[in-house]
Protein backbone atom coordinates (compact mmCIF):
# COMPACT_ATOMS: atom_id res chain seq x y z
CA UNK A 1 0.00 0.00 0.00
CA UNK A 2 2.73 2.41 0.99
CA UNK A 3 4.72 1.52 -2.13
CA UNK A 4 1.72 2.28 -4.37
CA UNK A 5 1.24 5.66 -2.68
CA UNK A 6 4.86 6.72 -3.37
CA UNK A 7 4.67 5.43 -6.94
CA UNK A 8 1.46 7.41 -7.51
CA UNK A 9 2.96 10.55 -5.97
CA UNK A 10 6.07 10.23 -8.15
CA UNK A 11 3.97 9.71 -11.27
CA UNK A 12 1.85 12.77 -10.44
CA UNK A 13 4.94 14.94 -9.86
CA UNK A 14 6.51 13.88 -13.16
CA UNK A 15 3.33 14.45 -15.16
CA UNK A 16 2.85 17.88 -13.58
CA UNK A 17 6.39 18.89 -14.51
CA UNK A 18 5.76 17.92 -18.15
CA UNK A 19 2.59 20.04 -18.19
CA UNK A 20 4.46 23.10 -16.90
CA UNK A 21 7.26 22.56 -19.43
CA UNK A 22 4.77 22.72 -22.31
CA UNK A 23 2.91 25.82 -21.19
CA UNK A 24 3.15 28.75 -23.68
CA UNK A 25 6.25 30.56 -24.80
CA UNK A 26 8.21 32.97 -22.64
CA UNK A 27 7.42 36.65 -23.16
CA UNK A 28 10.34 38.47 -24.75
CA UNK A 29 11.47 41.47 -22.70
CA UNK A 30 11.67 44.72 -24.66
CA UNK A 31 14.95 45.84 -23.07
CA UNK A 32 16.91 45.60 -26.33
CA UNK A 33 20.19 47.53 -26.59
CA UNK A 34 22.53 47.95 -29.57
CA UNK A 35 25.21 45.27 -29.87
CA UNK A 36 28.71 46.35 -28.83
CA UNK A 37 29.91 45.38 -32.33
CA UNK A 38 27.66 47.82 -34.20
CA UNK A 39 29.06 50.44 -36.54
CA UNK A 40 29.23 53.88 -34.86
CA UNK A 41 25.76 55.44 -34.70
CA UNK A 42 23.88 52.29 -35.74
CA UNK A 43 20.99 51.03 -33.58
CA UNK A 44 20.69 47.50 -35.02
CA UNK A 45 21.34 44.64 -34.41
CA UNK A 46 20.20 44.70 -30.80
CA UNK A 47 20.41 42.22 -27.91
CA UNK A 48 18.20 41.97 -24.81
CA UNK A 49 18.80 40.61 -21.31
CA UNK A 50 17.29 37.22 -22.26
CA UNK A 51 19.92 36.80 -25.04
CA UNK A 52 17.49 37.34 -27.92
CA UNK A 53 18.77 39.27 -30.94
CA UNK A 54 16.75 41.70 -33.06
CA UNK A 55 17.74 42.71 -36.58
CA UNK A 56 16.62 45.52 -38.89
CA UNK A 57 17.60 45.75 -42.54
CA UNK A 58 16.55 48.51 -44.95
CA UNK A 59 15.75 46.89 -48.30
CA UNK A 60 12.53 48.42 -49.69
CA UNK A 61 12.63 46.56 -53.03
CA UNK A 62 13.31 43.11 -51.51
CA UNK A 63 10.80 40.26 -51.55
CA UNK A 64 12.33 38.27 -48.68
CA UNK A 65 14.99 38.94 -46.06
CA UNK A 66 16.45 36.38 -43.67
CA UNK A 67 19.31 36.53 -41.17
CA UNK A 68 21.39 33.35 -41.21
CA UNK A 69 22.93 32.64 -37.80
CA UNK A 70 23.56 28.93 -38.26
CA UNK A 71 21.00 28.03 -35.59
CA UNK A 72 21.05 24.26 -35.92
CA UNK A 73 19.51 24.10 -39.39
CA UNK A 74 16.39 26.10 -38.47
CA UNK A 75 16.90 28.35 -41.47
CA UNK A 76 17.80 31.49 -39.58
CA UNK A 77 15.53 34.36 -38.63
CA UNK A 78 12.93 35.48 -41.16
CA UNK A 79 12.36 39.23 -41.10
CA UNK A 80 8.98 40.89 -41.64
CA UNK A 81 8.55 43.92 -43.88
CA UNK A 82 7.37 47.19 -42.32
CA UNK A 83 5.50 50.02 -44.07
CA UNK A 84 8.69 52.12 -44.34
CA UNK A 85 10.48 49.45 -46.42
CA UNK A 86 12.60 48.14 -43.57
CA UNK A 87 12.66 44.51 -42.49
CA UNK A 88 12.70 43.54 -38.80
CA UNK A 89 12.78 40.29 -36.86
CA UNK A 90 13.81 38.70 -33.57
CA UNK A 91 15.50 35.33 -33.11
CA UNK A 92 13.14 32.45 -32.29
CA UNK A 93 15.01 31.63 -29.09
CA UNK A 94 17.79 32.87 -26.85
CA UNK A 95 21.29 32.64 -28.28
CA UNK A 96 24.40 31.24 -26.60
CA UNK A 97 26.64 33.78 -24.91
CA UNK A 98 29.60 34.98 -26.93
CA UNK A 99 30.43 35.95 -30.51
CA UNK A 100 28.36 34.78 -33.50
CA UNK A 101 29.01 35.19 -37.22
CA UNK A 102 25.97 35.88 -39.40
CA UNK A 103 24.97 37.11 -42.83
CA UNK A 104 21.86 38.61 -44.37
CA UNK A 105 20.08 36.79 -47.18
CA UNK A 106 18.18 39.25 -49.39
CA UNK A 107 16.24 37.58 -52.21
CA UNK A 108 18.74 34.70 -52.26
CA UNK A 109 21.93 36.79 -52.17
CA UNK A 110 24.24 36.76 -49.13
CA UNK A 111 25.33 40.13 -47.77
CA UNK A 112 26.93 41.57 -44.66
CA UNK A 113 24.79 43.66 -42.33
CA UNK A 114 25.80 47.32 -42.87
CA UNK A 115 24.87 48.06 -39.24
CA UNK A 116 27.63 45.97 -37.71
CA UNK A 117 31.35 45.42 -38.06
CA UNK A 118 32.59 42.65 -40.37
CA UNK A 119 34.92 39.86 -39.26
CA UNK A 120 36.95 37.34 -41.23
CA UNK A 121 35.96 33.78 -40.46
CA UNK A 122 34.58 30.70 -42.20
CA UNK A 123 36.71 31.60 -45.25
CA UNK A 124 34.89 34.92 -45.82
CA UNK A 125 34.04 38.26 -44.26
CA UNK A 126 30.81 38.12 -42.28
CA UNK A 127 28.86 40.26 -39.86
CA UNK A 128 29.25 39.63 -36.15
CA UNK A 129 27.10 39.99 -33.05
CA UNK A 130 28.16 39.65 -29.42
CA UNK A 131 25.75 38.16 -26.88
CA UNK A 132 26.99 39.44 -23.49
CA UNK A 133 28.02 36.83 -20.92
CA UNK A 134 26.30 36.79 -17.53
CA UNK A 135 29.71 37.05 -15.82
CA UNK A 136 31.22 39.72 -18.09
CA UNK A 137 31.67 42.17 -15.21
CA UNK A 138 34.20 39.82 -13.60
CA UNK A 139 36.52 40.20 -16.62
CA UNK A 140 35.95 43.92 -17.24
CA UNK A 141 38.74 46.42 -16.64
CA UNK A 142 38.21 48.21 -13.35
CA UNK A 143 39.83 51.14 -11.59
CA UNK A 144 41.37 49.38 -8.59
CA UNK A 145 43.98 50.60 -6.10
CA UNK A 146 47.55 49.72 -7.05
CA UNK A 147 50.48 49.24 -4.73
CA UNK A 148 53.93 50.73 -5.03
CA UNK A 149 56.55 48.55 -6.73
CA UNK A 150 60.07 48.85 -5.35
CA UNK A 151 63.30 46.90 -5.27
CA UNK A 152 64.63 45.95 -1.84
Regions found by a protein language model. Give the residues of each.
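Bacterial N-terminal signal peptides
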Residues: 7-17
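The feature marks proteins involved in alpha-glucan
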Residues: 21-47, 93-152
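Aromatic-rich carbohydrate-binding modules that target alpha-glucans
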Residues: 46, 56-97, 109-122
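Structural beta-strand segments of beta-rich domains
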Residues: 51-55
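Positively charged n-region of N-terminal signal peptides that target proteins for export
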Residues: 1-5
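Polar low-complexity intrinsically disordered regions enriched in Ser/Thr and small residues
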Residues: 16-19, 73, 88, 101, ...
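A generic structural signal for short, non-catalytic loop/turn and secondary-structure boundary residues
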Residues: 11, 60, 144-147
Amino acid sequence: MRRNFFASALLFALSASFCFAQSGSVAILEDFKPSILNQPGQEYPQVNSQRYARFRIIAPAADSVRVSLGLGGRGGTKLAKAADGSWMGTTAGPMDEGFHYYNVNIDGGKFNDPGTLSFYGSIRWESGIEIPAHDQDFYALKDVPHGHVQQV
